[in-house]
Curated annotation (Swiss-Prot):
Expressed at high levels in the colon, testis, ovary, prostate and lung. Expressed at lower levels in the brain, bladder and heart. Not detected in liver. The modification N-acetylserine is found at S2. This is Twinfilin-1. GO terms for biological process: actin filament depolymerization; barbed-end actin filament capping; negative regulation of actin filament polymerization; positive regulation of cardiac muscle hypertrophy; positive regulation of neuron projection development; regulation of lamellipodium assembly. It is linked to Defects in TWF1 has been found in a patient with isolated coloboma, a defect of the eye characterized by the absence of ocular structures due to abnormal morphogenesis of the optic cup and stalk, and the fusion of the fetal fissure (optic fissure). Isolated colobomas may be associated with an abnormally small eye (microphthalmia) or small cornea. GO terms for molecular function: actin binding; actin filament binding; actin monomer binding; ATP binding; cadherin binding; phosphatidylinositol-4,5-bisphosphate binding. The modification Phosphothreonine is found at T349.
Length: 350
């Protein structure tokens, strides 16, 4: 189902999703068990959506166990009934569980059908995802007023279940929650790329030592970029894309997240997916790096000159996406997926 964590939907889930989209159910609770998405419980409507909401949703929320809940509204769009997607990640749940559910969220939405999901609500306490909490969420979405400190904290957690902690004394960034620092060597390489002293930086996660380290800074031309993508392990890449556009010479920094699918362990896929947003936030916020485009690929063959150009200078702007999947050669691709970056809250999102 997804290369982000390797979690797949059971056949029962797929069948129930199909019936749910036709309006049969009011609520579905989905959990991860034995590396599969499974249905924990489901309910049929008994009243209007707002009268059903609290009595259906709140009893299903466990204090130490994340889950997903799909709650059907009474309204419809062109694709059918509209749904609320609730991501429940309680404060007292295990960090590994938080990471796993965060990294699998996009794949569940894709399996269900993103066009059916009207709103997404994230919660760490029941008040966040109660009917009152949902109405507050709707109000905050329609209001131009700035977020409160608590709302901003929840927004950041929604992006990923790990927080960023800047070490003032050590001058390196720490991914709190999974406690993966960026090595000084890697951080300095990113600074050099931002100052145009390098044109390529590759980072990897040293899983054993729990640190993001520098893997490669080889001077790289566009034609050589596919060769930099490992076939058996995940990597983060920052590439200075030098090109011309409408008569102007441009140097654009592109972020590439390469994940070769099931040749990587589930833990590796989970960690790379979970750490990605925080890494980008550090780079963009602390280094003031202007990352023009964020791309996810399965293999280096997808990085053609035409693809990079079209991604940096898209012909249509109907729907802006933080991460974009390349079209790639037929037969060489895994399942398509979209992943959101930190600069764009999951309003589009693995």
């Amino acid at each position: 189902m997804s290369h982000q964590t390797g979690i797949q939907a059971s056949e029962d889930v797929k069948e129930i999703f199909a019936r749910a989209r036709n309006g049969k159910y009011r609520l579905l609770k989905i959990s991860i068990e034995n590396e599969q998405l499974v249905i924990g419980s489901y309910s049929q409507p008994s009243d209007s959506w707002d009268k059903d909401y609290d009595s259906f949703v709140l009893p299903l929320l466990e204090d130490k166990q994340p889950c997903y809940i799909l709650f059907r509204l009474d309204s419809q769009n062109a694709q059918g009934y509209e749904w609320i997607f609730i991501a429940w990640s309680p404060d007292h749940s295990h960090v590994r569980q938080k990471m796993l559910y965060a990294a699998t969220r996009a794949t569940l939405k894709k399996e269900f059908g993103g066009g059916h999901i009207k709103d997404e609500v994230f919660g760490t306490v029941k008040e966040d995802v109660s009917l009152h909490g949902y109405k507050k969420y709707l109000l905050s979405q329609s209001s131009p007023a700035p977020l409160t400190a608590a709302e901003e904290e929840l927004r950041q957690i929604k992006i990923n279940e790990v927080q960023t902690d800047v070490g003032v004394d050590t001058k390196h960034q720490t991914l709190q929650g999974v406690a993966f620092p960026i090595s000084r060597e890697a951080f300095q390489a990113l600074e050099k790329l931002n100052n145009r002293q390098l044109n390529y930086v590759q980072l990897e996660i040293d899983i054993k030592n729990e640190i993001i380290i520098l893997a490669n800074t080889t001077n790289t031309e566009l034609k050589d970029l596919p060769k930099r993508i490992p076939k058996d392990s995940a990597r983060y890449h920052f590439f200075l894309y030098k090109h011309s556009h409408e008569g102007d010479y441009l140097e654009s920094i592109v972020f590439i997240y390469s994940m070769p699918g099931y040749t990587c362990s589930i833990r590796e896929r989970m960690l790379y997916s979970s750490c990605k947003s925080r890494l980008l936030e550090i780079v963009e916020r602390q280094l003031q790096m202007d990352v023009i485009r964020k791309i996810e690929i399965d293999n280096g063959d997808e990085l053609t000159a035409d693809f990079l150009y079209e991604e940096v200078h898209p012909k249509q702007h109907a729907h802006k996406q933080s991460f974009a999947k390349p079209k790639g050669p037929a037969g060489k691709r895994g399942i398509r997926r979209l992943i959101r970056g930190p600069a764009e809250t999951e309003a589009t999102t693995d």
